[in-house]
């Protein structure tokens, strides 16, 4: 007997509905509930919880609609039955997201060992990272739709199975090609697992206050994966070699499958829109072709017909994507949202955040190993200031934005991140760690200050019905920036090396470029956020029939399409 997700609840996309924010920070999940409080209001957080209390009252009135599969008269037992499994469900969803986030950072520590054992160049390392991030970025929006249409438990466990099997393939990969293929499959699994885990958690907590607590725990506990990645990667690689960083996922995945099959209840949204297959395919191919040109350009030469052809194909594919999305009734990416200046500015800045953060992080361990001569384990520990700063500062970013406004906090964060990266561009082989760690920490603080307020700005730029969609797009744009960051900064390093410069000089150029772009974005964002206003009110949203309505993509849980 499983709890069905068709009880009365706040409409998806309203201030009380859950918005998918992929970044694993507590305040980002809180900001997703912020609704449409004033852009500069110091009372934004208070307004958020006041709105949730009002919605909770409405939910209480609708609890009579709660049904259980196979026993429509057992409404009175629904809440008690679900509570008995909530601890298990929270553990299962947190562990799944932990795996996804761990793989975002654990690979970086192992890159030097991969390069040595697989006899690959910088280009190969770029593909190892970008193959995973690319698929997560481009399939994340559609993953939530799959979960709503085909069942959240089914999609979650399928994602776990694919991710676990792909991890085994990665650990056994005899060559670079097999490893990249495994990373592609990992990305597909992660894109299904992540939004489905959040949807499962929301469906089990129909009361808004309960959702906030559950999602806060989900975000906080799973976010430990970010901080644990560099250390775990260094320890495992030093002791057993790079395959061990993927083998660590196997016991977690097996446990999740066994427990999930037994204890998770199924839920879905029957009114979810059709999956935008043409848009999804075109988005993956477009970004993939562009990434190919950027990564391989340094090796083949920027004037190579293949590279020039890839850039030309990118333009054609992008035009096709825009044309397809403009004509669909339920597009993966509603282009009309970019008519809001605030939405466009916040997502543009989020691309730069992903670009600079992931692009620079790709080289941190390589700098400590190849330039300063550290061991793989030591290098993993030396990169900790970035992730620790982000984990510590992120919970306060939303509060600062509520008090001082998005413009001040975002501009300050981007400026600090840019200055930190510029400072990293001036370190050398003989620079002591005492003069390096603060540069890493400064960049981490800056990125943490910028990310969740940028998501909040994107949410407030649109109507309440589309708040979840806005947060999902914000997460996707950051991931796209991450793909491009690894590709572009890697191209800078390789181009400098092909011109006779040392690897150290190439790294300095890459860090300086990332810092300059981030500082320029701080100026651009500060100017344009000051002139932007949230979207005006629209018609009241329609009531969803799904109490677990989680807007994870193109309004999968919104009935307004």
Where does each model-flagged region fall?
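Intrinsic disorder in cytosolic terminal tails and internal cytosolic loops
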Residues: 48-85, 528-561
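Membrane-helix boundary and inter-helical linker elements of multi-pass secondary transporters
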Residues: 148-149, 172-174, 237-240, 295, ...
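12-transmembrane solute porter fold
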Residues: 83-102, 107-109, 118, 122, ...
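Short hydrophobic alpha-helical segments enriched in small aliphatic residues
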Residues: 3, 7, 23, 34, ...
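Extreme N-terminal basic, low-complexity initiation segments
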Residues: 1-15
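Transmembrane-helix bundle of Major Facilitator Superfamily
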Residues: 73-262, 394-397, 404, 408-429, ...
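Hydrophobic transmembrane-helix bundles of small-molecule transporters
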Residues: 58-63, 67-68, 216, 238-351, ...
């Amino acid at each position: 007997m499983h709890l069905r997700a068709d009880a009365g609840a706040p409409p998806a996309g309203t201030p009380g509905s859950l918005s998918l924010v992929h970044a694993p920070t507590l305040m980002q999940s809180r900001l997703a509930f912020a609704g449409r409080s004033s852009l500069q209001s110091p009372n934004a957080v208070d307004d958020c919880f006041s709105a949730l209390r009002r919605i909770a009252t409405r939910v209480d009135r609708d609890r009579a609609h709660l049904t259980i599969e196979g026993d429509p008269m057992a409404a009175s037992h629904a809440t008690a039955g679900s509570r008995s499994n909530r601890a298990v469900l929270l553990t299962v969803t947190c562990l799944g997201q932990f795996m996804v986030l761990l793989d975002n950072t654990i690979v970086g520590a192992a890159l030097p060992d991969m390069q040595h054992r697989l006899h690959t160049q910088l280009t190969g390392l770029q593909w190892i990272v970008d193959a995973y991030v690319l698929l997560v970025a481009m399939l994340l929006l559609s993953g939530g739709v799959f979960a709503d249409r085909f069942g959240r438990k089914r999609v979650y466990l399928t994602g776990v199975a694919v991710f676990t099997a792909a991890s085994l393939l990665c650990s056994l990969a005899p060559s670079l090609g097999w490893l990249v293929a495994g990373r592609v499959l990992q990305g597909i699994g992660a894109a299904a697992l992540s939004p489905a885990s959040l949807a499962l958690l929301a469906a089990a907590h129909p009361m808004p206050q309960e959702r906030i607590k559950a999602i806060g725990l989900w975000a906080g506990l799973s976010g430990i994966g970010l901080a644990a990645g560099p250390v775990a990667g260094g320890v495992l690689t030093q002791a057993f070699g790079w395959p061990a960083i993927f083998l660590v996922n196997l016991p977690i995945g097996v446990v999740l499958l066994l427990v999930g099959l037994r204890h998770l209840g199924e839920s879905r949204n029957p009114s979810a829109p059709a999956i935008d297959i043409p848009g999804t395919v075109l988005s993956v191919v477009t970004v993939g072709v562009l990434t190919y040109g950027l990564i391989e350009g340094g090796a083949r030469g920027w004037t190579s017909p293949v590279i020039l052809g890839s850039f030309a194909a990118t333009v054609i594919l992008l035009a096709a994507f825009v044309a397809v999305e403009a004509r669909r009734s339920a597009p993966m990416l509603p282009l009309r949202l970019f008519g809001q200046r605030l939405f466009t500015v916040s997502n543009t800045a989020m691309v730069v955040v992903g670009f600079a953060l992931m692009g620079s992080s790709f080289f941190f361990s390589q700098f400590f190993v190849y330039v300063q001569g550290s061991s793989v384990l030591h290098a993993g520990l030396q990169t900790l200031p970035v992730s620790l700063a982000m984990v510590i500062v992120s919970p306060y970013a939303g509060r600062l934005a509520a008090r001082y406004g998005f413009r001040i906090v975002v501009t300050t964060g981007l400026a600090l991140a840019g200055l930190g990266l510029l400072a990293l561009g001036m370190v050398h082989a003989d620079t002591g760690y005492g003069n390096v760690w603060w540069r890493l920490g400064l960049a981490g603080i800056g990125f943490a200050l910028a990310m969740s307020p940028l998501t909040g700005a994107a949410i407030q730029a649109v109507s309440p019905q589309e708040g979840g969609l806005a947060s999902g797009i914000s997460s996707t744009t950051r991931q796209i920036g991450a793909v491009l960051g690894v590709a572009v900064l890697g191209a800078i390093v390789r181009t400098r090396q092909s011109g006779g410069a040392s690897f150290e000089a190439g790294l300095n150029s890459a860090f300086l470029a990332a810092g300059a772009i981030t500082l320029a974005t701080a100026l651009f964002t500060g100017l344009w956020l000051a002139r932007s206003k949230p979207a005006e009110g629209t018609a009241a949203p329609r009531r969803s029939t799904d109490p677990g309505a989680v807007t994870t993509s193109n309004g999968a849980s919104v009935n307004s399409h």
